[in-house]
Amino acid sequence: MKKLKILILIILFNLVTFKSIQACDLLSVEIGENASTLGFLSSFEEEDIDPNDSVTIFESQTTAFCQDIDFGSTLVKGYLTMDGIIGAVEIVVQNNRNNRASEQGLLRNFVKANFGDFNINSEEWPGYKIWNIGPKQIFYYYSERENEPTKEGVAVTNEQYYNVLLVNEYEN
């Protein structure tokens, strides 16, 4: 009977762990670690990194990182330093002129539910919000310009590597 209880606990633990592996958990991204530690970046080759650029950006379908959440029309980007280190991971909404993807609010609602509330319709909305959670930074941005697609996304990085999001500003 005791062995059966232990077996059930092991099975439950594995189910919970497997679900969290599939979850879209930005805080689980190991910023500063080798790219091979992150699923959708694990298949890149060293020769894929441009030695002339301080940052190489890899893009993939968001489902490669977030298997259990539908954000609509989005991409996931991995920002790697020239030595193959993860500097940031970003989920970007792919809007067209009518901004249908952002109007659905799928990414915005995910960010609010996981990191905190904000109001993009406020007169004081600066266009972004940053949360410092432990050693990591979550950066959400949303900006509208007339006659242009809305820019919306969320990224995880840290103080040491946040400049990779500025691509040309990163210094090792």
Predicted regions and their residues:
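Cys/His-rich metal-coordination motifs, chiefly Zn-binding "fingers/knuckles"
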Residues: 1
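Sec-dependent N-terminal signal peptides
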Residues: 4-16
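Sterically constrained small-residue positions within well-ordered secondary structures
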Residues: 14, 69, 82, 121-122
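Bacterial Sec-dependent signal peptides at the C-terminal "C-region" and cleavage site
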Residues: 15-23
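Non-cytosolic coordination micro-motifs
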Residues: 22-62, 88-172
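Compositionally biased P/S/T/G-rich terminal and signal peptide-adjacent segments
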Residues: 61-83
